[in-house]
């Protein structure tokens, strides 16, 4: 009996390392996507060829053909008229690398997944969860093209709505993987008050809302205007006439650069306040040390992220600083996931042992 259990434990350990690798790949994918956006490279490839598109142009004639395709869209005519072929190659390589990494992630997920199923290393509930994650990954590829297509006919950039959808879906997949990874950890259940559980869940939800707002800021280039802090447009809270001049009023939440940047700022303040209150509650209530450490790291990460956001704004979105800001956002999300999951009932070693037997 000991040998089969040990074998299943070995399988689950391999599954955990595979999921760590996948989470790192998705984080890298988000950063490459951010660089692609910041360098205005996302519309350089005007076709979606999931299989044959994995190869870049291999001859001068193919490069010219790809460049001619780019010349046919509004972005070239209105923003990059006169661009040379060498300049086009620079933006092409960013978008091509982003798509290639997406293809690699699909393969890196599917092949080990099939192998683990063949070896009987996955219990049925874990298989279902991983199939859902794989399906979301396929959907993400389609959403990526849906986003790119929005900038090929009339616009000179992709739709901020579709950009935000693309980013949030990627981070939902990331969240599902990290959560699943945590559920495979060997740890006892962590006791926590209802209030701490609620605030940890609220923090995770607010982080996602803030990530969505951040994507809208990126899509509208709203970080390149109103580059002052703590005031915005001359005051801490702009006038309602400026915030809601578009009709219907709700369109301002997505289309008005002032409103979009303002709500991103306000959400940052709200997140920071909730994180600090969560930490104080954990300390005062003498919560489990793991919960206190998680709350502390989350508050510190949010402090760093807020500082980076302010600097990115004041310096008018330099690429490297903006990418660091995006990278720390992933760290904040990871800490929020871990803290929220920590509040749920963990699996004891005995439960994991039973899970391993069930997988057999």
Swiss-Prot record:
Broad class of the protein's primary localization: membrane
A GO CC term assigned to this protein in UniProt: plasma membrane
Compartments it resides in: Cell membrane
Record-level Gene Ontology MF annotations: metal ion binding; oxidoreductase activity, acting on NAD(P)H, heme protein as acceptor
Catalytic activity from the UniProt record: Fe(II)-heme o + 2 A + H2O = Fe(II)-heme a + 2 AH2
Biological process annotations from GO: heme A biosynthetic process
Entry's family note: Belongs to the COX15/CtaA family. Type 2 subfamily.
Subunit and partners: Interacts with CtaB.
Full protein name: Heme A synthase
């Amino acid at each position: 009996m000991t040998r089969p259990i040990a074998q299943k434990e070995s399988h689950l350990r391999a599954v955990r390392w595979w999921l760590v690798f996948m989470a790192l790949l998705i984080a890298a994918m988000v950063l490459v996507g951010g660089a692609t956006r910041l360098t205005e490279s996302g519309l350089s490839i005007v076709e979606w060829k999931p299989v044959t598109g994995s190869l870049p142009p291999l001859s001068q004639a193919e490069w010219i053909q790809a460049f001619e395709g780019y010349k046919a869209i509004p972005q070239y005519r209105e923003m990059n008229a006169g661009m040379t072929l060498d300049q086009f190659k620079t933006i092409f390589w960013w978008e091509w690398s982003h798509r290639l990494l997406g293809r690699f992630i699909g393969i890196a997920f599917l092949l080990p997944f099939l192998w683990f199923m063949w070896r009987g290393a996955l219990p049925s509930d874990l298989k279902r969860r991983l199939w859902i994650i794989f399906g979301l990954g396929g959907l993400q590829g389609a959403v990526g093209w849906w986003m790119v297509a929005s900038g090929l006919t009339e616009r000179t950039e992709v739709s901020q709505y579709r950009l935000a959808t693309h980013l949030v879906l990627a981070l939902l997949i990331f969240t599902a993987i990290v959560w699943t990874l945590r559920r495979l950890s060997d740890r006892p259940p962590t006791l926590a008050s209802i209030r701490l559980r609620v605030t940890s869940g609220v923090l995770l939800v607010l982080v996602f809302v803030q990530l969505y707002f951040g994507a809208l800021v990126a899509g509208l280039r709203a970080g390149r205007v109103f580059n002052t802090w703590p005031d915005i447009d001359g005051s801490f809270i702009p006038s309602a006439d400026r915030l809601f001049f578009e009709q219907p009023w709700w369109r301002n939440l997505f289309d008005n650069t002032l409103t979009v940047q303002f709500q991103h700022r306000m959400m940052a303040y709200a997140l920071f306040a909730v994180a600090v209150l969560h930490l104080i509650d954990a300390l005062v209530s003498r919560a489990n040390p793991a919960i206190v450490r998680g709350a502390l790291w989350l508050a510190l990460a949010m402090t760093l992220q807020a500082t980076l956001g302010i600097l990115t704004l004041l310096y008018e979105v330099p690429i490297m600083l903006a990418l660091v800001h995006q990278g720390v956002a992933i760290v904040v999300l990871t800490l929020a996931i871990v803290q929220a999951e920590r509040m749920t009932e963990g699996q004891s070693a005995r439960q994991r042992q039973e899970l391993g037997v069930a997988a057999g």
